[in-house]
A protein has these predicted regions:
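N-terminal [4Fe-4S]-dependent radical SAM core
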Residues: 2-72, 81, 85-93, 108-116
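Glycine-centered loop/turn positions within well-structured domains
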Residues: 78
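Conserved Radical SAM active-site core
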Residues: 12, 36, 51, 67, ...
Length: 170
């Protein structure tokens, strides 16, 4: 009986890890930039070539209509008492993700989004702490015909121009 429990527990751990890596998002499927020193990372962040991402998920919950890819960005200047995602507050807790990799991920799911009336949602943390990255992904998503949604406190609204806001559906 002990051997059965041990084998079952091992299989359960393996299946949970498989689900986490392939179905649940996390950061699977993204190649993290390596070899960038601090100065180069800051420049890439400022230009939007990379973004610091806490995690991502495909879901049908409260992050907008239809089936959505919700990207949880790292970093937030606020410390709201009832924050849903306090684990996203620190920018350094996120992983750098290349812009091209994020756009490829959106492209991979665009047919699903169109079939379900879904799209991509940026949440956080505070997405507007990384306006160049989010804006460039939204622009690419809109060019693909993918619905876009920004979940923000609005605290950093000055970081977005009217032109950038035009790429946001909700």
């Amino acid at each position: 009986m002990a051997a059965f429990r041990s084998t079952t527990a091992h299989m359960l751990r393996e299946s949970k890890e498989y689900a986490r890596q392939t179905l649940m998002g996390g950061l699977s499927g993204f190649e993290s930039p390596v070899g960038l020193d601090r100065r180069d990372r800051l420049q890439a962040l400022k230009s939007g070539d990379i973004g610091f991402v806490h995690s991502w998920d495909i879901n049908t919950s409260v992050d907008g209509p239809g089936t959505r890819m919700t990207v949880f960005m790292s970093g937030c200047p606020l410390r709201c008492q009832y924050c849903q995602n306090p684990d996203t507050w620190k920018m350094r807790d996120g992983q750098p993700v290349y812009l091209d990799d994020m756009i490829k991920k959106v492209d991979r799911y665009k047919d699903l989004f169109k079939a379900t009336g879904g799209g991509i949602t940026f949440s956080g943390g505070e997405s507007m702490m990384q306006p160049a990255f989010v804006s460039r992904v939204f622009r690419a998503a809109r060019e693909m015909g993918v619905h876009t949604c920004l979940d923000t406190s609005g605290f950093l609204g000055r970081n977005y121009s009217d032109e950038q806001i035009d790429d946001i559906d909700l």
